[in-house]
Amino acid sequence: MKITISREDFNKIYEHALSVRPEEACGLIAGEDRDSGIRVIEKVYILTNTDHTNEHFTIDPKEQLTAIKDMRANGLKPLGNWHSHPESPSRPSEEDKKLANDSKASYLILSLMEEGNPVLNAFHIELKNGEKTVRKEELLII
């Protein structure tokens, strides 16, 4: 699947991730799936990582509920989540794979490993034959 995110939303995620580093930053993504097969991110939600650690994240449940209500009020579809890896590459960790339970979701991971060179990738994670499989999705910053 091809996914698009605006430069403005990319910058919003990046700036927040820098502001909470060395902790992982996290949030949700919302938008629409177009008939053309393109997933369009129309809004990103910056949410609190209640774990306050650089190794994993848990989204604040109250903030998550507020974000879901906002999506519904604005006619947006929940598309998945995003989080940062302050000290590791932009790919799902074993923990990320273990916690990925929505086969329809896109998982965006922003690496801050290389100073001044943020790397954002999108992934699809699903259970196949008893194992979690990861597929990189095409992500366009427009």
Residue ranges and their predicted role:
Residues 1-78, 87-142:
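Conserved beta-strand-loop surface patch within small alpha/beta domains used
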Residues 84:
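Short, well-ordered beta-to-alpha junction loops that form the rim of enzyme active sites
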